[in-house]
Amino acid sequence: MSEIPSDLKYIETHQWVRVDADGTATVGITDFAQEQLGDVVYIGVPEMGATVNGGEEAGVAESVKSASDVFSPVTGEVIEINEKLEDEPEIVNEDPYGDGWMFKVKLADEGELEGLMDAAAYAEHVAAEE
């Protein structure tokens, strides 16, 4: 069974978001997503200063067996990217909810979080796909 932390919000395309008190939203792919991909060999993230839109493509995760678009759960300006992933994309496999985060966004609208899944809803979504 995939790990699904309870302090995060999720979208159906298997990305997660953690929002800090200052409105910074950290985005990554879920444990389920990295398991489905297999060994990740490349992570593409949006450029610094770019605007990402909730539910829209913002990057890519490529593995030895497939490639998958990465969608942003929230809308906002990209304020940080995880540069470690450029040389060590396998961190996404090893620690998808920690050091394997992909990018950080200055959240444009906290109300957007209301439409995202909590851990229980995401667990049901994953169970339906397994």
From Swiss-Prot:
Record keywords: Lipoyl
Cofactor: (R)-lipoate
Co-factor binding comment: Binds 1 lipoyl cofactor covalently.
InterPro entries: 2-oxoA_DH_lipoyl-BS, Biotin_lipoyl, GCV_H, GCV_H/Fam206, GCV_H_sub, Single_hybrid_motif
Residues in coiled coil: none
Highest rank taxon of the organism: Bacteria
Gene Ontology biological-process annotations: glycine decarboxylation via glycine cleavage system
Subunit comment: The glycine cleavage system is composed of four proteins: P, T, L and H.
HAMAP family: GcvH
Role description: The glycine cleavage system catalyzes the degradation of glycine. The H protein shuttles the methylamine group of glycine from the P protein to the T protein.
Protein's UniProt name: Glycine cleavage system H protein
Organism: Marinobacter nauticus (strain ATCC 700491 / DSM 11845 / VT8)
